[in-house]
């Protein structure tokens, strides 16, 4: 058996221009075949060569020709050319007047399908009418990467945290919760999302308790200026987006809303103390719900689940409610926001505003009968990718870039909440779920 680059005998291996790189790769590939498959008279020729004592010399010459052909391949081709997928399996090799079919092809490159690339997203967070900013937002696209032989998948993490009493629990959740979810996701091969999220939230709650005992007590700058950090906590609404699923874990009164085919679909339920099942759970644990400016646990906390708030345990728990939703082609976007938005804006109104904003930016919101000139169209298409990078602002240590349209949509929602006299901090994350797929050669 020999690895050869088979060409016409009269053609020489010469350098090829850059523009013919794709044609060259498709026309001349690396094959593994026996000499008898190439030429029916190969066996006879081999015997004659052996008798003449030049068999080894002939093999060396073929190997030399192959190395020359391999070295003459274009080495400066662009990434776009390198991303071409070689999928032709029917190969015909010509040798003068004869043609050889049924050749066993061993491709030197694998076609890898990379699904669900980094989604477009935008974020806006404002203090509003509050004196202190106690919200926190975490954006970690591609925080988990899994690869099989023929595919790569990326999981994306988005979280919104609404602190109360002070901001340090929300800030701690922003720093650590995605790492805990990542550890659980990599260690759990069965992808049991409910158990994974429950373990992650429980670990986060325990870390907050230990961190408060060792670090915060001496330097606590709580809203009430008290050294007792047990009265500090945070809500958490977290979404992990995979190519097939949308996983939402919620603890508190922040909310996740999916827009599917123009309709608002809530993926979480607020944990209010007067919710029937939460009220029963609190009373069974020996607690009470007192109405003091709304329903509150022991007349203090206006939510029945949160991370932290040690002085209210076991009535207030950190166990999240987890929903797993199958993704469809009708999914448009996902909104994660604190109660500063949802207290004054309905799910339907928020989805309508974001949908109008995204459709306008993508050109779908153009009025009926309005045409677009070819020059204008090409100019907008040319600027579309540029706006995603240049017109957006960076977030995070790794320079993650937000999408301009999603950012503007989240800003509009915060402005709407303030216009409706929201009295709380307002934080909004908008994630575009419209699919983008890319094929490339690894």
UniProtKB/Swiss-Prot annotation:
Keywords: Cell membrane, Cytoplasm, Growth regulation, Hydrolase, Magnesium, Manganese, Membrane, Metal-binding, Nucleus, Protein phosphatase. Mn(2+) 1 binds at residues 162-163. Residues 30-100, 363-401 are annotated as: Disordered. It catalyses: O-phospho-L-seryl-[protein] + H2O = L-seryl-[protein] + phosphate; O-phospho-L-threonyl-[protein] + H2O = L-threonyl-[protein] + phosphate. Mn(2+) 2 binds at residues 162, 339, 424. GO terms for molecular function: metal ion binding; protein serine/threonine phosphatase activity. InterPro entries: PP2C, PP2C_BS, PPM-type-like_dom_sf, PPM-type_phosphatase-like_dom. Binds 2 magnesium or manganese ions per subunit. Its cofactor is Mg(2+); Mn(2+). It is found in: Cell membrane; Cytoplasm; Nucleus. Pfam families: PP2C. Expressed in shoot meristem, vascular tissues of cotyledons, and in primary roots surrounding the root meristem. Highly expressed in seeds. Residues 376-390 have a biased composition (Basic and acidic residues). Residues 120-433 form the PPM-type phosphatase domain. Disruption phenotype: No visible phenotype under normal growth conditions, but mutant plants exhibit reduced sensitivity to abscisic acid (ABA) and glucose during seed germination and seedling stage. Freshly harvested seeds of mutant plants exhibit increased seed dormancy. Part of a K(+)-channel calcium-sensing kinase/phosphatase complex composed by a calcium sensor CBL (CBL1, CBL2, CBL3 or CBL9), a kinase CIPK (CIPK6, CIPK16 or CIPK23), a phosphatase PP2C (AIP1) and a K(+)-channel (AKT1). Interacts with AKT1 and CIPK23. Interacts with PYL8/RCAR3 in an abscisic acid-independent. Interacts with PYR1/RCAR11 in an abscisic acid-dependent manner. Belongs to the PP2C family. Involved in the negative regulation of the K(+) potassium channel AKT1 by its dephosphorylation, antagonistically to CIPK proteins (e.g. CIPK23). Functions as a positive regulator of abscisic acid-mediated cell signaling during seedling growth. Involved in the regulation of seed dormancy. Acts as a negative regulator of seed dormancy by inhibiting abscisic signaling and subsequently activating gibberellic acid signaling. This is Protein phosphatase 2C 3. It comes from Arabidopsis thaliana. The gene is AIP1.
């Amino acid at each position: 058996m020999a690895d050869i680059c088979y060409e016409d005998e009269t053609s020489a291996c010469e350098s090829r221009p850059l523009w013919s790189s794709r044609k060259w790769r498709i026309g001349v590939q690396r094959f593994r075949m026996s000499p008898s498959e190439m030429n029916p008279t190969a066996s006879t020729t081999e015997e004659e060569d052996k008798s003449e004592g030049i068999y080894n010399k002939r093999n060396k010459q073929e190997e030399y020709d192959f190395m020359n052909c391999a070295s003459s391949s274009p080495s400066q081709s662009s990434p776009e050319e390198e991303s071409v997928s070689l999928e032709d399996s029917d190969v015909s090799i010509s040798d003068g007047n004869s043609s050889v079919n049924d050749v066993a092809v061993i491709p030197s490159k694998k076609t890898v399908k990379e699904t669900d690339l980094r989604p477009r997203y935008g974020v806006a967070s404002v203090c509003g009418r509050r004196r202190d900013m106690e919200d926190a937002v975490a954006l970690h696209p591609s925080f988990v990467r899994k690869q099989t032989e023929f595919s790569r998948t990326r999981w994306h993490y988005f979280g919104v945290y609404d602190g109360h009493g002070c901001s340090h629990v929300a800030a701690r959740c922003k720093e650590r919760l995605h790492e805990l979810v990542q550890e659980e996701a990599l260690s759990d091969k069965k992808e049991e999302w409910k158990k994974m999220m429950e373990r992650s939230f429980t670990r986060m709650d325990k870390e907050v308790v230990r961190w408060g005992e060792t670090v915060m007590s001496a330097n606590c700058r709580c809203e009430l200026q008290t050294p007792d950090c047990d009265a500090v906590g945070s809500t958490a609404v977290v979404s992990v987006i995979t190519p097939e699923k949308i996983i939402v874990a919620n603890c508190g009164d922040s909310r996740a809303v999916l827009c599917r085919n123009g309709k608002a679909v809530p993926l979480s339920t607020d944990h209010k103390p007067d919710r029937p099942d939460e009220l029963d759970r609190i009373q069974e644990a020996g607690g009470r719900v007192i109405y003091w400016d709304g329903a509150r646990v022991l007349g203090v906390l206006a939510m029945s689940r949160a991370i932290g708030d040690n002085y209210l345990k076991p009535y207030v728990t950190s166990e999240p409610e987890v929903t797993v939703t199958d993704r469809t082609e009708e999914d448009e976007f996902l909104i994660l926001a604190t109660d500063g938005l949802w207290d004054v804006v309905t799910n339907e109104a928020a989805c309508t505003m974001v949908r109008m904003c995204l459709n306008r930016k993508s050109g779908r919101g153009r009025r009926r009968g309005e045409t677009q000139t070819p020059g204008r169209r090409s100019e907008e298409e040319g600027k579309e990718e540029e706006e995603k990078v240049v017109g957006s602002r960076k977030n995070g240590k790794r320079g993650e870039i937000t999408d301009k349209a999603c950012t503007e949509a989240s800003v509009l929602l915060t402005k709407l909440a303030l216009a409706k006299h929201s009295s709380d901090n307002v934080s909004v994350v908008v994630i575009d779920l419209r699919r983008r797929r890319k094929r490339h050669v690894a």
